[in-house]
């Protein structure tokens, strides 16, 4: 899979992942924002920008880093529509190796970057490098357990992290884990809500 796949996927007027902030991003980051009315954040592999734009609506500078030009174009458009274009930045880069225009940031978010463990480790390593000491990293993924017990998400175990695999990755990073747990993500379908197992990581940069 390369950027052309994602460009084709995002090549629609609709926002395929909606324009509403992910509920786990909101739940875990709202208390952090409350302690710091102005800040900077990176949304790694942020797609169409729903999470980054939400941060900018709270008065934060946000940077959406993604490798799909189509997604980033929609992210910038959404920022304009929401009146936060002056607070939102977008640039194309690979998640495993990027340079941020806002570094060092206060919060680094990575939501649903479903890639093999080594690629995920490289992406988190780069993200952590761009977060200031005392800042936070929030990760949200379809969990490995979702393959057997949940609805939606990838059907490939290799791109589904677990609490154990994320613990292993974090052991090599300058972070302190504050939350690492499976949550019920729940997927809205035409037949109602379906159970979906989501793994959430909140860590403080040392």
Where are these regions (language model features)?
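A short glycine-rich, Lys/Arg-flanked "PGG" loop and its adjoining helix->strand segment in the class I
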Residues: 121-133
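Conserved SAM-binding strand-loop segment of SAM-dependent methyltransferases
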Residues: 83-95
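Conserved beta-strand signature within the Rossmann-like core of class I S-adenosyl-L-methionine
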Residues: 134-142
